[in-house]
Amino acid sequence: MTRIKRGYIARRRRTKIRLFASSFRGAHSRLTRTITQQKIRALVSAHRDRDRKKRDFRRLWITRINAVIRERGVSYSYSRLIHDLYKRQLLLNRKILAQIAISNRNCLYMISNEIIKEVDWKESTRII
């Protein structure tokens, strides 16, 4: 067998890892073994938090919509609004509704009033 020279390959791998961890504090940016452990941990946290961010924003949007809706009508809530939106087959997602609730509350009130009128009218004309 012939001899294989791979002198700089390991060094190149370690410098690449060190560049990733250059902003870490203490031994986490200096020692190779702890750098690799912290890199794995950082990537796991980033992957987990990308999913968590979606959940957190959805929760924030729901809270904002519910707060604005409950200000106007005492008996009307977020869950009834979303249910009535689906009944009327309106394509307004929670993100858009939350933006409308923050920027222009009157517009959200008009949307909810139209939905309530439409649903009440359909229920009152239904033949049993």
Curated annotation (Swiss-Prot):
Localization per Swiss-Prot or TrEMBL: Plastid, Chloroplast
Purpose of the protein: Binds directly to 23S ribosomal RNA and is necessary for the in vitro assembly process of the 50S ribosomal subunit. It is not involved in the protein synthesizing functions of that subunit.
One GO biological process term: ribosomal large subunit assembly
InterPro entries, sorted: Ribosomal_bL20, RIBOSOMAL_L20_CS, Ribosomal_protein_bL20_C
Protein's UniProt keywords contain Manganese: no
Predominant location category: plastid
UniProt organism field: Nicotiana tabacum (Common tobacco)
GO MF terms, alphabetically ordered: rRNA binding; structural constituent of ribosome
Keyword terms: Chloroplast, Plastid, Ribonucleoprotein, Ribosomal protein, RNA-binding, rRNA-binding
Keyword set includes rRNA-binding: yes
HAMAP family attached to this UniProt entry: Ribosomal_bL20
GO cellular component, one term: chloroplast
UniProt similarity note: Belongs to the bacterial ribosomal protein bL20 family.
Protein name per its UniProtKB record: Large ribosomal subunit protein bL20c
